[in-house]
Amino acid sequence: MATRHQVRQAIVSLLYSNEINPVTAEFEDEFLEEKKIRNERKNEAQQTFKEVLANKEKLDEILKPHLKDGDFSKVGATELAILRLGLYEMKFSQTDKAVIINEAIELAKELGSDQAPKFINGVLDKIKGDL
């Protein structure tokens, strides 16, 4: 069974892909199968992915004041996907915020630029106090 970390990696990848080209249900299924995310974890990944997309405008409203000049164009697509997922989890899940931020930092180390972990930590830590 896939770990929660692997599920988060897959969700970030789907969010990133969706920024470039809207993700189809077929692509989503094939991608999750390729990553060996199945059964309950697959349902969890699909549900979270859909909910992040459904709440994208609300999440971006919360993120905007914490970005330099409120400018999303200066944030890489991978980093933005990690921020959206982290913020979604902080706002809508029961998981401890410190755990969510730590997980987002780990995702940034694996998937983002060299400066991404520090950036992700700074933004989510500031937002944590507002939620």
UniProtKB/Swiss-Prot annotation:
The keyword Transcription regulation applies. One of its GO terms (biological process) is DNA-templated transcription termination. GO terms for molecular function: RNA binding. InterPro entries: NusB-like_sf, NusB_fam, NusB_RsmB_TIM44. Keywords: RNA-binding, Transcription, Transcription antitermination, Transcription regulation. GO terms for cellular component: cytosol. Gene3D superfamilies: NusB-like. It holds the Pfam family NusB. Involved in transcription antitermination. Required for transcription of ribosomal RNA (rRNA) genes. Binds specifically to the boxA antiterminator sequence of the ribosomal RNA (rrn) operons. Belongs to the NusB family. HAMAP family: NusB. This is Transcription antitermination protein NusB. It comes from Campylobacter concisus (strain 13826). The gene is nusB.
